[in-house]
Amino acid sequence: MSDLHNESIFITGGGSGLGLALVERFIEEGAQVATLELSAAKVASLRQRFGEHILAVEGNVTCYADYQRAVDQILTRSGKLDCFIGNAGIWDHNASLVNTPAETLETGFHELFNVNVLGYLLGAKACAPALIAGEGSMIFTLSNAAWYPGGGGPLYTASKHAATGLIRQLAYELAPKVRVNGVGPCGMASDLRGPQALGQSETSIMQSLTPEKIAAILPLQFFPQPADFTGPYVMLASRRNNRALSGVMINADAGLAIRGIRHVAAGLDL
């Protein structure tokens, strides 16, 4: 039996991409899974596909009332909350400082930070009482842009650096009751969109990046799928496998940190 059997897991943005892969993985692990998802169509799809195994709540991560409504439903259903995974986010399609008009930069900043930073903070606030009571955990999705430049423009990169500070502060404030950690995946096949303020709300990340371009920059030389990143979340959510980690950010970058100066990887001819 999995360590996560009957654990109550709350994931934001569970309708597609990494969020959907996390829903699939935690259900596979035997957990009671809930998600807060903005898209009504994706909520309907989740309910149709997973039935009683999913509690899918339509709502916006920038709205505290939506979070509280979801948490209330989770507690009614499961009687507890063991892990909150803040995952919903948006990207800026590498919109640069120089080429973005000032007024667009300002509105884009507020929209992107509302989702990527405030959304995490509001989720933590809504989930904290139940997680403190059950001595559970929080996990937040970061990005390779939390460590390196070039994984997005200044708006996205700054938002992911802000999220690392949020993780550290929450880990400090909530210790010893709640473990707080992060996972930073590299580029993957997903439906990640951009801010409406930048005209990117209907543009997927895969319209800006090709599988070949992503694989070429990674020392492990493959095009990651969302399911490739679910393992660290499972480990961090498990009380048995993670008793000692808090304030830790796992850089799941397919080797980006060890790229060579002359070559992406030295073993390409092995």
Swiss-Prot record:
Report which superkingdom the organism of origin falls in.
Bacteria
The family database entries (InterPro entries) matched by this protein are listed as: BphB-like_SDR, Dihydrodiol_DH_HcaB, NAD(P)-bd_dom_sf, Sc_DH/Rdtase_CS, SDR_fam
Any one GO molecular-function label of the UniProt entry: 2,3-dihydroxy-2,3-dihydro-phenylpropionate dehydrogenase activity
Give the signal peptide, or none.
Answer: none
An annotated GO BP: 3-phenylpropionate catabolic process
Binding residue positions for substrate: 143
Report the active site residues: 156
User: What is this enzyme's EC?
Assistant: 1.3.1.87
**Name of one Pfam family that matches:** adh_short
SUPFAM superfamilies per the UniProt record, alphabetical: NAD(P)-binding Rossmann-fold domains
Q: Where does NAD(+) bind?
A: 10-34
In which pathway is this protein known to take part? Answer: Aromatic compound metabolism; 3-phenylpropanoate degradation
UniProt keyword list: Aromatic hydrocarbons catabolism, NAD, Oxidoreductase
Q: Has keyword NAD?
A: yes
| Reaction equation(s) it catalyzes | 3-(cis-5,6-dihydroxycyclohexa-1,3-dien-1-yl)propanoate + NAD(+) = 3-(2,3-dihydroxyphenyl)propanoate + NADH + H(+); (2E)-3-(cis-5,6-dihydroxycyclohexa-1,3-dien-1-yl)prop-2-enoate + NAD(+) = (2E)-3-(2,3-dihydroxyphenyl)prop-2-enoate + NADH + H(+)
The protein's matches in HAMAP family, at most eight in alphabetical order, are given as: HcaB (MF_01647)
State the similarity comment.
Answer: Belongs to the short-chain dehydrogenases/reductases (SDR) family.
* Biological role stated in the UniProt entry: Converts 3-phenylpropionate-dihydrodiol (PP-dihydrodiol) and cinnamic acid-dihydrodiol (CI-dihydrodiol) into 3-(2,3-dihydroxylphenyl)propanoic acid (DHPP) and 2,3-dihydroxicinnamic acid (DHCI), respectively.
Name it. Answer: 3-phenylpropionate-dihydrodiol/cinnamic acid-dihydrodiol dehydrogenase
Organism (species):
Escherichia coli O157:H7
